[in-house]
């Protein structure tokens, strides 16, 4: 595994900083109601929404945000990283679910944060998202609490399970 400030390479993946031209590929994921089921916002209905989201990701301050586009074979398959350190999250195109890509990207990101001297990573997960709960558990995250009604996503009020990984 190799990482520089702007990218992380694993056996199968390249995690790199967002580019404005990533919006269309990311919109395919962010407009998918199944992929976005447990995300903190409703699916994006317009490409302009995703363009704004990608622009924010691309222009972010690396001192407070360590966010990456995940690619496999040159194809954008999702994102993983911290939009507000130490909290991080991940989102993959559902075509790539169940193949170990999220776990591989997460392991590399954890190692990166460890090498940079971070003391912890945290995550806020919808308790219905069993796949994410399992991945976090496999990587050593420990549940630190639960709360009801923490996210308003469209018409739905969602709950949270909080996790922490000491680095």
What are the residue ranges of the model-derived segments?
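Residue-level recognition of the GNAT/N-acetyltransferase active site
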Residues: 93, 124-128
